[in-house]
Amino acid sequence: FNQAALGATMNQISMVIEPEFIISTGDNFYDSGVASVNDPLWTYSFEQIYKGNFLQVPWYVTLGNHDYRGNIQAQIDYSDISRRWTLPAPYWYKTESIDDTDVSIEFTFIDTTPFQDDYYKKAKYKDVVSKTDTLAQKKWIIERLGKISDVNWNIVVGHHPMYTGGKRVNDASYTRKHLESLFDENYVDVYFCGHEHDLQHIKPENHNTHHLISGAGSEV
């Protein structure tokens, strides 16, 4: 899509807000991920696109379903090559603070693709998702969120939304089925996600979490 225009716009905005880091909500390489750490897409779709001075900050990354069509281990391994790209594991966490304030933020990055029940029936996903361990990830999420206390913001980042006003309603239902109770029990403040190719802010009644969807920025 229009990645060059998006990269230029992000650089213009970053000159004003001077971000300390940037978050990707997955589908990092459209349409089929990357093949290896030497895939030319690293250059053509990342390094040469997001090259502005103010974009030379850590990029905190999560995986999307299109990344699963390629080599997800290569995206993890690229963390050892790039000083910006940060994806140490399919699911991971990061503690941040806002400069010159007492505000602390806990980010929990999760891998939502294995929680999409219908992917286990689709040829382009079933072989790779069947090798994942959703129980292990759920256990990790429970333990991780359970340890969070005395922070100003408890934020989770994933790819698939739980709620949407868009067309991917079925996908959202699977995410909600597997994860919403964990968010409720652990008072997650915000869930950043993508998948839908638009921007949405949803706050379901009787739930604490604000859902912020930002997917396919180059299309928006």
Summary of predicted features, one role per range:
Residues 1-40, 165:
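N-terminal active-site segment of His-dependent metallophosphoesterases
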